[in-house]
Amino acid sequence: MNEITIGIIGLFVLVAVFLTGFELGFAMALVGFVGYSLIISVKAGFGMVAQDVYDVFSTYGFTVIPVFVLMGQIAYNGGIARRLYDSAYRFLGHIPGGLAMATVGGATAFGSVTGSTTATSATFASVAIPEMDRYGYSRILSTGVVAASGTLGCLIPPSVPLIVYGIITEQSIGKLFLASVFPGLLVALFFMFIIYGWCSLNPSLGPKGERSSWKARIASLKEIAGVAIIFIVVMGGMMQGLFTPTEAGSVGAFAVAVLAFATRDINLKGIFKSLKESLVTACMVLILITGSAIFGHFIAVTKIPMVTADWIMQLPLHRHLILVLIGLIYLLGGSFIDDLAFMILATPIFYPIVVKLGYDLIWFGMFLHLTVMIGVIIPPVAVNVFVVRNITKESFGVIYKGVTPFLLSLALVVCLLFVFPQIALFLPSFLQR
C-alpha cells in the first residue's frame, strides 16, 4: 500500500475506534503511531511519539490549561461560581436563557485571557454547567452552549493558534489580533441571539425566572466584589503585560483560594478535591492535544495534505470556489485534530496557494480560524464536544443536539466575512496606519 492509502484507512480506523468508546486522545495516538510506523519504521514511530509527548508536556504555553482549570474548580467548590451565577441570575434571570447568555459573555472574557478552545470548554464545563443545572436548564442547552463557547477561546485575542499562524505566514501578530476582534464579538453576539430565540420558542430549555428588584441586584454585586477585583487584576495584568497567561492563571487561582478561605466557603479537603479534579481535567485535555499531534505527524507523512493542495491548484475553478474547498479541508481537519495541531500541519501547505489566488493573508487567517472552529464542534470527533462529554458524562447525542444551532451562527459569520472582508480588515487598517 502507498502512503495515501494508509492515510485514508487511518482516518476510517480512527473514527471506528472512537465509536467503540475508546478515549479520543489515545485513539489518535494509537492510529498515528501504527500508521507512522507502517510508512517509516517502528523505531521512527516510537521516536516520534516520544518527541510529541515531550513537546506537548514541556510547552510553556500549555501550562495555562491546568492553572485556569484549577481556578475554575476552586471557584466552583468554594461557592464563588455559585455567587457569580446568582448575581448573573438577578440581572439576566428574567430573560429566556439568561444564564446561558452569561456563559457566552464569560467565555468571551475568559478566551481573551487563555486563547485556548479546550481550556475554555474544560473550565466552563466544570463551572457553568452545574450552575445551569441548579436553575433548571436543559442539558441540551447547557452542554451545547459550553462546547460552542469554547470556540471563542481561539477567536478572541490573544489566541495561540493566531500566533502560530502569524509565525508560519510571517504576518503581524498585532494585526491578526486586531482582525479577530470584530469576528469574535460577532460570534458571541450571534450566540446570544440564538439562545434568546431558541429559549423563547422552547422555554423549558432555559426557563426564565422572576424579575429581580434593583435593590436585590445591587446586593448581589456586593457578594461578588472580591471576585470582580480578582478578575480586574488578572485581566488588567494580562493586558498590561505584567503577567503571562499562565502567571495570570496562577495569580487568579491563588487569589480565588484566599478569597474562598477568607469567606469560609472552602477548607483543605475542598482544595485537595479541586486539585484532583483539575489534574484529571488538565491531563485529559493534554492527552487530547498530544494524541492530535501524533496523528497530525502521521497524516503529514502520508502526503495527503500536499496531494490535496496540488489537486486543488489544478482544478479549473474560480478562486472563490478554490477558497471554499480549502475551507472545507480546514473544517474537516478541525473535526479530527486539535485546532492548533491542524494549523501547524496545514497552513504551510495552503497559504502559498492563497497568496497565488490574491487573498489577503490577514483576512485568510480569520477565515480559516472560523472554519476550524466549526470543525471542533462537528462530528465525527469534535474535540470540544469530547471535552464537555468527558467532564459532564453527558451523552454525545445530547451535546451534538445542543451545538447544532450554534454551528449555524458560526457558518453565518464565515459567510459575512467572505462577503464583507472589512469585518476583519477594518481595525488593522484603521489602527495601524
Feature locations, PLM:
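Alpha-helical transmembrane segments of multi-pass membrane transport proteins
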Residues: M1-R433
